[in-house]
């Protein structure tokens, strides 16, 4: 065990970052692409039901799934950042205690979300942005998704902890296996067993449970930290570090959910087609950015290990390398998305009104999409270094500080076109805000070590 950990330490602190980050990133990129693909699978197969209300319901419930994911990322990123730095310090005892504390805390929180959500199902559906016509579909989909909340939150913790230990391959196997299963189960449950939109939800939670089991097995392999209930330490010290490391993710994911709710509320004025179109565009853009997020996840353990070991020059090298690669990637994705916008939207809902609304929104977002390379890599760098204040500020900037007020202001002044262009405006403002903050972080890394 100790020999495996020492070899992993040498790998993370001595291999050139231009070789190490792609090696760490490849499983993460595959995981993110497959995850984004199966997130779109529900939208695709539900779209085949030929109902704008059903397609809209998937978009409405997506905001709650984002909240559940936010909880998972809070505990996963919070514990994972701590783990990577402590392994960098060769402090394996505290790293092991943090792993168990983060995992079981997320599991308990998922159970709480499940119980409360089922108790207040209909009010929750309206809060998420459901209309009266969408409500029956929303309740059918939402009630099943809530049942999977415990393992949805805890599997994200396992995924993040494995990545931060440099074991992204185990994380990839767990995530991709569940994703492939989901894609197979969707048509079976929706059409063959005639479960409709509820079948899509069952496919999602069954596949995520399989992922959870495989990720749990991965924690016992390759010198990774093992999870034990006896290792859970309900100490303020550990929860403070979870809070510091996970708050940016909670803020980012949580506000993404709030932003989706605001978007649905603004779009509902223009009918089910508008809600369906904006939901489809969200899924497309998520898929477009998934490779960038995956590459950044490959950068994070490299950042954490080397920051913990005091090798600040490697942290800076890794940041610049990641920004360059992801900028080129997003530029290519943006060009393809802009050129093929009508065709992409029509894959999920072949309705003229949905296609028209979605095409304009997708093209607006493609204009500024490549700027996310600097914003996201910078935010991941800040978060992994434990710089809670700038990391949290930048995490809330895009969807909270800028998007939420922008979508309401533009909706009131420009109507539907304002809703369609709101994300583009928010992305530009976020980039302008992030430049001086990340420059300050890079200067901090250039200062003499104390």
Predicted regions and their residues:
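Membrane-helix interface/capping residues of multi-pass secondary transporters
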Residues: 43, 52-55, 92, 121, ...
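Helix-terminus/linker motif at the lipid-water interface of multi-pass membrane proteins
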Residues: 33, 37-55, 125-132, 188-195, ...
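Short alpha-helical transmembrane segments in multi-pass integral membrane proteins
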Residues: 1-25, 83-150, 192-247, 303-368, ...
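Short runs within selected transmembrane alpha-helices of multi-pass transporters and secretion channels
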Residues: 76, 145-163, 171-179, 200-213, ...
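Transmembrane helical elements of multi-pass membrane transporters/channels
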Residues: 23-42, 144, 178, 207-211, ...
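Hydrophobic transmembrane alpha-helices of multi-pass small-molecule transporters
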Residues: 67, 182-186, 212-216, 287-290, ...
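Small-residue-rich hydrophobic transmembrane alpha-helices
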Residues: 55-115, 152-171, 277-341, 372-394
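N-terminal transmembrane alpha-helices
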Residues: 12-44, 48-49, 63-78, 82, ...
């Amino acid at each position: 065990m100790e020999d495996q950990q020492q070899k992993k330490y040498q790998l993370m602190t001595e291999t050139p970052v231009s070789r190490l980050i792609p090696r760490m990133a490849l499983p993460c990129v595959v995981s993110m692409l497959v995850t984004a693909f199966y997130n779109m699978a529900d939208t695709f197969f539900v779209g085949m039901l030929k109902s704008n209300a059903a397609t809209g319901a998937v978009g409405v419930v997506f905001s709650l799934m984002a909240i559940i994911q936010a909880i998972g990322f809070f505990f996963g990123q919070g514990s994972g950042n701590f783990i990577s730095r402590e392994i960098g310090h060769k402090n394996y005892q505290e790293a092991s205690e943090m792993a168990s504390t983060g995992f079981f805390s997320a599991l308990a929180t998922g159970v709480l979300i499940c119980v409360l959500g089922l108790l207040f199902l209909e009010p929750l559906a309206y809060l998420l942005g459901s209309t009266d016509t969408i409500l029956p579909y929303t309740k059918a989909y939402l009630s099943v998704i809530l049942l999977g909340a415990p393992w949805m939150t805890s599997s994200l913790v396992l995924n993040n902890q494995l990545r931060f230990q440099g074991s992204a391959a185990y994380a990839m196997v767990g995530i991709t296996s569940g994703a492939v299963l989901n894609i197979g189960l969707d048509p079976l449950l929706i059409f063959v067993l005639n479960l409709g939109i509820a079948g899509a939800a069952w496919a999602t939670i069954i596949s995520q449970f399989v992922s959870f089991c495989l990720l749990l097995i991965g924690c016992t392999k390759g010198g990774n930290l093992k999870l034990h209930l006896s290792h859970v330490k309900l100490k303020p010290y550990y929860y403070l570090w979870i809070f510091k490391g996970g708050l940016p993710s909670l803020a980012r994911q949580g506000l993404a959910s709030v932003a989706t709710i605001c978007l649905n509320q603004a779009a509902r004025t223009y009918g089910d087609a508008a809600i369906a179109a904006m939901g489809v565009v969200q899924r497309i853009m998520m898929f477009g950015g998934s490779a960038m997020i995956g590459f950044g996840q490959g950068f994070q353990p490299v950042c954490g290990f080397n920051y913990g070991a005091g090798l600040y020059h490697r942290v800076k090298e890794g940041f610049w390398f990641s920004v360059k690669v992801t900028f080129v990637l997003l530029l290519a994705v943006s060009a393809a998305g802009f050129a093929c916008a009508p065709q992409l939207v029509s894959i999920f809902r072949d309705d003229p009104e949905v296609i028209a609304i979605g095409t304009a929104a997708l093209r607006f977002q493609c204009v500024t999409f490549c700027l996310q390379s600097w914003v996201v890599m910078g935010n991941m760098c800040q978060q992994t270094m434990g710089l809670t204040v700038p990391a949290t500020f930048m995490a809330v900037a895009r969807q909270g500080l800028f998007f939420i007020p922008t979508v309401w202001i533009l909706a009131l002044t420009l109507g539907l076109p304002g809703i369609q262009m709101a994300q583009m405006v928010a992305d530009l403002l976020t980039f302008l805000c992030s430049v001086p903050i990340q420059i300050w972080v890079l200067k901090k890394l250039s200062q003499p070590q104390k």
